[in-house]
Amino acid sequence: MILTNCAACAAPLAHDAPRCVRCKTRYCNSTCQHDHWRRGHKQICKKIHRGGNAEQYNADQKYKEAVAVAVEACADDTKGQTCYICTEAVHWKTKEGLVRGCACRGAAGFVHASCLAEQAKILIAEAEDNNLYPTERFYERWRRWDTCSLCEQNYHGVVCCAVGWACW
């Protein structure tokens, strides 16, 4: 996702708009850049830079928000269940709860959004390492971002949104 609005005033940006040297946050002009720096950008600039610059940092924040919404929306349905990928109820690293956003029935289909994202990243990396692009085998792996590997139905609703932000 390319950020197309000034971080200070939200005005649309030209393609060659000025940027923060460290984190690449974009501004409509140097006045907005200086104003944004004084209003607190300097406190988060290093964090944005470490997070992969402005666009990746923004996508990561949106992913975290979307996962929180998805876990909350699925909370009643997922009580007492475990992730079919890592077999844990609460993810060991992210501490996130389970989601369910496909057509699986019974005890199948409960998963952590971060487990789905990690599985998809591994499959895509494997496909790229094996030079499968642009074959059907590559696209089968790419579909893991939006399709359940168990029921082969598309994820929907808040789960689709969370996994979509993960693939950024």
Predicted features and spans:
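Small Cys/His zinc-coordinating "RING-like" fingers
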Residues: 1-18, 75-102, 150-160
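Short Cys/His-rich Zn2+-coordinating modules
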Residues: 2-7, 58-72, 119-135
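The −1 position to Zn-ligating cysteines in a subset of zinc-ribbon hairpins
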Residues: 5, 19, 26-31, 41-44, ...
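Cys/His-coordinated zinc-binding microdomains
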Residues: 10, 24, 33-36, 46-49, ...
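Short functional micro-motifs and their immediate structural scaffolds
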Residues: 11-15, 27-28, 33, 37, ...
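Short linker/helix segments within small regulatory modules
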Residues: 16-24, 35-40, 98-107, 127-145
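Cys/His-coordinated zinc-finger cores
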Residues: 24-44, 107-125
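RING-type zinc-finger domain of E3 ubiquitin ligases
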Residues: 46-49, 111-157
